[in-house]
Amino acid sequence: MTIKDLKEGQSATICTVGGDGALRQHFLDMGVIPGIEVKLIKYAPMGDPLEIRIHDYELTLRLADAEQIEVSDKKSDEDEHRKDNKKDKALVEHPGLGEGGKYHVKADEHPLPKDEILTFALVGNQNCGKTTLFNQLTGSNQHVGNFPGVTVDRKEGMIKGYPDTRVTDLPGVYSLSPYSSEEIVTRQFVFDEKPKGIINIVDATNIERNLYLTMQLMELDIPMVLALNMMDEVRENGGSIRINQLESMLGIPVIPISAIKNQGVDELIEHAVHVARYQERPGRQDFCDPEDHGGSVHRCLHGIMHLIEDHAENAGIPVRFAAAKVAEGDAEMEKSLHLEQNETEMIEHIVSQMEEERGIDRAAAIADMRFDFIQRICRQTVVKPAESKERIRSRRIDAVLTGKYTAIPTFILIMGAVFFLTFNVIGAVLQNLLGKGIDYLTAQMDQLLTAWSVNTVLHSLVIDGIFKGVGSVLSFLPIIVVLFLFLSLLEDSGYMARVAFVMDKPLRKIGLSGRSIVPMLVGFGCTVPGIMASRTLPSERDRKMTILLTPFMSCSAKLPIYAFFATAFFPKYKALVMVGLYVVGILTGILVALIIRKTLFKGEAVPFVMELPNYRMPALKNVLQLLWEKAKDFLQRAFTVIFVATIVIWFLQSFDLHFNLTADSQNSILAVVAGLIAPVFAPLGFGDWRISTALISGFMAKESVVSTLSVLTGSMDVIHKILTPASALSLLIFCLLYTPCVAAVSSVKRELGSKWALVVVFGQCVVAWIMAALVYAICLCF
């Protein structure tokens, strides 16, 4: 019997974990090991993937992967352990180790030089509050979400009040096995940068799974502290953790904190600075019990340590960590050690003997050794409530949001509400108010310049260039901020992870996994972070496909274009046209995905293995910070890139080839240059040189399409003369699909290289031309 054969709500005990390679190791690292109880929660609305509960957290996997995990009806002893823990809820005083700790021996101090920078690596599982803690430590405003893998790159900052420190926020990982790009980045940072200390943040509500990474970090023999986050939730749900007993068993300082409430952070900083300054390394790194299963794993690890000791020292890798990785079959580690053939053969002999004695394979044996140690710790130090309030709430919400018959309609309803409120209600009202304010300021400035008899050239620059150009873009700020507000709320609440779960099966039909939905949804806000979010995908194939498809998801910078032309040509159907453009972008992306799946990216999507976090109320501070960052970014672009582009466009439009001021813009430098490419767009219905100019400026920033047209035409009457409703709709389709802005192209280049960046630029222009020509031809038939 396998997990696939279980019924919803049925529990069983894992017997064997099949499969091979990095995926199997990833399963083991996440606690899917023999002897552990697993419960099938539900199937996705379309029947695949499924959701299981293991180690007190929810995990998703596909049916094909579930078939690889054999289970039996035998019950686990976990409930008995939980009952034993509830007998004593006595809390132990704190602190014990670290700064001010009663176990600290002053005579053993060997501090680093005072002028040496203390570097820290902030490491933790995905979705454990790591970025929130980083913001508290440094005062930064990094994006905080409730989706596994929000941190897609390492970020650095100085700890507040400690100018001689530098802390790096690394991507969330479940282990230091090289399965995903995040794990590779984290592992390489620790090996290459050699931080003076590690701050390991652990989700106290799910401590058992989180401690697996803690054990691997301790094997690195780097001074570290453990930040026990979300302790407020543990206490509220009737649980507790014996801090000093946990410290004693781990041999590192343990500090209870609540990152979101900024509780315990000051104490954490004191401990972290202390252990780094005095290089107080973990008190233990050996977690294998000599008596466990006849001591087979213990003998194996210590035998390997003896063989590779010199190689590990030469490679700068802690010998205990290296031995554990070699024992579990980490090929990258074996390459790093440069072992001789006879040494490799000896290690294989030692491992084979251990597997024979232990009765399971090498990777499962090492994972079981770690989880066995973790369970012993948790039985003695952790008092768990029966079920947390957050879990109960999440289960009730999921009954609707991921229900078999309600998930898809609810998703459509939620996204429809987001667009309706953005374009028709909140965003539209605020846009009208801001637009009136800008018009008033423009009129006042025009009167002032006229009263002062300012030179006509300068007058034209200020009014026709700056105010009309930049002002036309600024009026769309409310729509963009409102859209980001809703996307932020959906991500922070944990709903995005459910969307990935629900949409995995349909996305697999176009060659992607459910996790790809999140970068593409983020792309509706801005393509750049959407492309960066693809780094959380463990497959290089999926990552490339997702990056190439994300620009087809219409970003918020195109909203000014849609609103401008929809208002001008389709005022009665403004909302319908704008929503329709988003649908066309999605459908075009699907079509492109089907084509490249059969040509450039043959093969199957990466397995869908993802944690489903509990729903959480988005923190007002985090949401406001995100909105401020997005608004500030938009304003900076409006007063830098768009401002400069507007002035350049005005200059080229106002002077001829001999740099004489021209009254007729058709004789301008701009008209001559743009006229060379205008014929390319003639079959699409917008062969006017002014439209060509606006499209070129849109490569710098999409918002500048509107500002450029405002400068070149001067009034809406001129735009109605050069465009018909059919050509306007064709132009909207082209703007929707043609090359993304230079910032997005730069992101593609950074992620995939120059070749793929050029593919995006020219490929999307070709797709946009074909689709626009098709729409224009259809419109002419009616």
List each language-model region with its residue ranges.
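Extended, low-charge hydrophobic alpha-helical regions
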Residues: 357, 364-368, 384, 428-466, ...
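Transmembrane helix-loop junctions at the membrane interface of multipass transporters and ion channels
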Residues: 556-579, 743-752, 772-782
